[in-house]
Amino acid sequence: VVRVSKRTVTFFPPAQARALIGDFTDWERNPIPLQGPVTLEFPEGAYVEYAFLDERGRPFPDPENPERADNPWWTYPRAVRLPGHRFEAPPQPREEPKVERHRLGERRFYVAEAGTSPKATLVAQDGVAFYRTAGLHRVAQALVEAGEIPPVRLVFVEPMDRNQEYRFSEAYEEEFHRVLGEVERSKGPLGEILLVGASLGGLFSLWQALRHPNRFPKVLALSPALKAHPGGTDAYRDREWLLERCAEAQVLPRIYLEVGLLEWLLAPARRFAALLADRKVPHAYRERASGHNWVTWKQALAPGLRYLLGEA
């Protein structure tokens, strides 16, 4: 059971609950021990995902809250919306683009086209999630139909081990470029390429734009996992190596950057946005009153595509 006020939520734990977890605790990383109800303060209008832990540390849903979070990873999160919450619903197309499945060796990827004779190519890491959960192809099609962006091709690349591949892996980088080459061979010129990624996928996309600025001039980065350095494995303690490289780079991409107020990557994203501002790099930056999840990221797709592909 939860009681919601203007800026606070009181969680009333069921009998078997020993801890509270959610976006605000980085889930199991910093659980809040429970001995009774607990009240937490959040930004006005926040969207909050949460769950409980039992005595064995296993997560389970709030049995009194029927609102399941739109979370592709786990079934136990439940959602709370504070007063004033407004979900910026992505636009929906009149006609949904057809998505084709492909494989290059063991690598799965998907290709779709929004409009005819695409002028640019959107390439998303965590391809299945951006296709099935976020509906990036539908958002792009709706914007094309509305005349807000030119026709685009979409490539959804699926990782096999995202934690390893997206952390500055040159082996995956080589395979990723082979996938783009295969798309170009089978579908035609890619045109301008816009990289899209969330969390570790956002980190990889920014890294690729830094390494190949002429090929990848634009990035849509959602809560990028900037706490990372080559050889590191700790998404909380690694140093922000990519920011160091961006501070030194002669050329930086045009970037649309979003992050949630309820996630541990907020401070790194703010530092990155400040660096872009200091260097006068064309960029847009936005914070939302939610966490490290697809509800946050889905809302960023349309404004991000408008900023990166629409007319100025």
Region locations from a protein language model:
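The feature captures the conserved acid-bearing segment of alpha/beta-hydrolase catalytic domains
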Residues: 229-289, 295
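Primarily recognizes the serine-hydrolase "nucleophile elbow" in alpha/beta-hydrolase
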Residues: 135, 190-242, 247-250
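Alpha/beta-hydrolase active-site loop
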Residues: 167-187
